[in-house]
């Protein structure tokens, strides 16, 4: 799942933009005020609705809406459109807002098709594999809290990776809770299988990333 093309019309300071994304990654650079954050915000606005359509759970809802200040000064409305490639199928989805009425519109057929493919390919009764995820790391993304004690508990499932995907303010609360739960599960499996070398695949993936960024190894002694 990826964006192939992004079209902006009268969005913030951008009168018109047509951006084609090529390759596996894209770098957007420029001096202050050229619209880098504007482009990222437009992508967030599209994915917020897509995530809400796919998940449809209150606790994972992304509160990210087009505002009147997103409409370029002097323009009657603003529009954001993107062409998505999902497993080889091209789908267009867009959102717009009219200044005079404040009404917001979206391409319901496009977002429904994206959601349908997502569920068919990744979350059907027969398939429970890895899913495409979206994460926004804005310039002002903050870690507000690193809790040492977990007072509330969550039920983790395949949708949990999309929690707070758009928000700029985050904490590690649910991550630590998930990690502890997985460690308990891993230890239980060691006893059940009578194999002290058993490793949970999810934990191993997180450990590998952590050790890589710390420039450390699991066998290092301190």
Residue ranges and their predicted role:
Residues 1-181, 185, 190-208, 214:
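P-loop NTPase switch/coupling surface
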Residues 213-222:
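Single conserved hydrophobic/aromatic residue that forms the stacking wall/gate
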């Amino acid at each position: 799942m990826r964006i192939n093309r992004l079209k902006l019309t009268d969005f913030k300071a951008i009168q018109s933009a047509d951006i084609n994304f090529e390759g596996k990654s894209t770098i957007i650079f420029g001096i202050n005020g050229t619209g880098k954050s504007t482009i990222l915000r437009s992508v967030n606005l599209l994915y917020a609705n897509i995530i809400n359509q796919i998940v449809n759970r209150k606790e994972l809802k992304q509160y990210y809406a087009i505002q009147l200040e997103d409409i370029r000064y002097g323009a009657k409305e603003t529009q954001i459109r993107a062409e998505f490639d999902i497993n080889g199928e091209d789908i267009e989805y867009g959102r717009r807002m009219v200044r005079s009425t404040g009404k917001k519109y979206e391409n319901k057929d496009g977002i429904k098709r994206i959601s349908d493919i997502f569920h068919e390919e990744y979350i059907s009764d027969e398939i429970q594999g890895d899913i495409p995820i979206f994460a926004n790391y804005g310039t002002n993304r903050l870690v507000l809290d690193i809790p040492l004690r977990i007072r509330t508990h969550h039920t983790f499932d395949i949708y949990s990776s999309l929690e707070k995907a758009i928000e700029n303010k985050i904490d590690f609360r649910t991550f630590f809770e998930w990690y502890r739960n997985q460690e308990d599960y891993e230890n239980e499996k060691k006893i059940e299988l009578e194999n002290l070398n058993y490793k949970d695949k999810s934990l191993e993936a997180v450990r590998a990333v952590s050790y890589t960024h710390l420039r450390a190894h699991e066998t290092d002694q301190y």
